Swiss-Prot record:
UniProt entry tagged with the keyword Nucleotide-binding: yes
NCBIfam families for this protein: ispE
Gene for this chain: ispE
EC numbers: 2.7.1.148
The protein's annotated pathway: Isoprenoid biosynthesis; isopentenyl diphosphate biosynthesis via DXP pathway; isopentenyl diphosphate from 1-deoxy-D-xylulose 5-phosphate: step 3/6
One Pfam family linked to the record: GHMP_kinases_C
Keyword terms, alphabetized: ATP-binding, Isoprene biosynthesis, Kinase, Nucleotide-binding, Transferase
GO MF entry, a single one: 4-(cytidine 5'-diphospho)-2-C-methyl-D-erythritol kinase activity
Alphabetical GO biological process terms: isopentenyl diphosphate biosynthetic process, methylerythritol 4-phosphate pathway; terpenoid biosynthetic process
Protein name: 4-diphosphocytidyl-2-C-methyl-D-erythritol kinase
Function: Catalyzes the phosphorylation of the position 2 hydroxy group of 4-diphosphocytidyl-2C-methyl-D-erythritol.
Binding site for ATP: 99-109
Length: 316
């Protein structure tokens, strides 16, 4: 049996609007999700035994059942017990390049990669929609990570409508290593502060979703108009995260003054990004940020927007 190494890209949010509560306890969301080429490498190697083993040298990445990559493997075992009996388990090695606890879907994309890899190793022949159906059982971001590119995500984030790929722009990403924002905390706090704005009527939710589909940001994406996209970036979670984390708020303010098309926090944070027209501009802004904030706790990356989801890098 072949071993596979898969490229697992991270993602940013270009748009995140919280519409209301769902009966399942999650929030009703409208998001525009975008893959970036800052990616982990996930290697799946058949191990000849009836178990999964997970390896990662990054000290902040768990290697037990709390890791989404491990949970993805166990889900495949539960769904396809005959194939697990026939082919056995795999050793999963994560080469972690996406920052941890950053709002960039690093855990979700690792889980998506394991689904894709086991589909190949176990010769299941699952289609992308079938893989995304399994992915939705693992987490809201995992279905998007399977397909990648640019997409509108609704429901709790698992209902995807792919749109014209946006791969002509770059981003500077910045994150304080010591700061981690709890996603459940961010949504819970938003509910406490802003539930008077929530919509519960299904028709009104659908109407709001349609407004975003037909709205100016979608038009800017279709036209690949970076300047307009930058002006229309939106994230409701900034309303609760930035007041609670002044370092992140200061970082966002600093980056917004450096040029580029627009600056925003991604997801529940704490990563902040600036949209750029070129690699050269992104590198220049990265250098300016470093000159203005000398804190060694601050990490910076440059990445290109990507039209790719999980990809096989090596089979052998």
């Amino acid at each position: 049996m072949h071993a596979y190494t898969l490229i697992a890209p991270g993602k940013i949010n270009l748009y995140l609007e919280i519409i209301g509560d769902r009966p399942d306890g999650y929030h009703e969301l409208i998001m525009i999700l975008q893959s970036i080429d800052l990616a982990d490498r996930i290697t799946l190697r058949p191990n000849g035994v009836q178990q999964f083993r997970l390896y990662c040298s990054h000290p902040q990445v768990p290697t037990d059942e709390s890791n989404l990559a491990y949970r993805a493997a166990k889900l495949m075992q539960q769904e396809f017990p005959k194939q697990f009996d026939n082919f056995g388990g795999v050793d999963i090695t994560i080469d972690k390049r996406i920052p941890v606890a950053a709002g960039l879907a690093g855990g979700s994309t690792n889980g998506a990669a394991v689904l894709v890899g086991l589909n190949l190793i176990w010769q299941l022949g699952l289609t992308q929609p079938e893989l995304q159906g399994l992915a939705s059982l693992l987490g809201s971001d995992v279905p998007f990570c399977v397909s990648g590119g640019t997409a509108i995500a609704t429901g709790r984030g698992e209902q995807l409508d792919p749109i014209y790929d946006l791969d002509n722009l770059w981003v500077v990403l910045a994150k304080y290593t010591s700061i981690a924002v709890s996603t459940p905390w961010a949504y819970k706090t938003y509910r406490q502060l802003f539930n008077n704005t929530y919509i519960s009527d299904r028709e009104r939710i659908q109407a709001r979703t349609h407004q975003v589909h037909a709205g100016p940001l979608m038009g800017a994406i279709l036209q690949k108009d970076g300047a307009k996209i930058g002006r229309l970036l939106h994230n409701d979670l900034e309303k609760v995260v930035l007041p609670e984390y002044p370092q992140v708020a200061h970082l966002r303010e600093t980056m917004a003054k450096m040029g580029g098309f627009g600056t925003m926090m991604s997801g529940s944070g704490p990563t902040v990004f600036t949209l750029c027209e070129s690699y050269a501009q992104a590198e220049k802004i990265k250098q300016h940020i470093r000159e203005n904030i000398s804190d060694i706790d601050l990490q910076l990356w440059v990445a290109q927007l990507s039209n790719m989801g999980i990809q096989v890098e090596i089979a052998g």
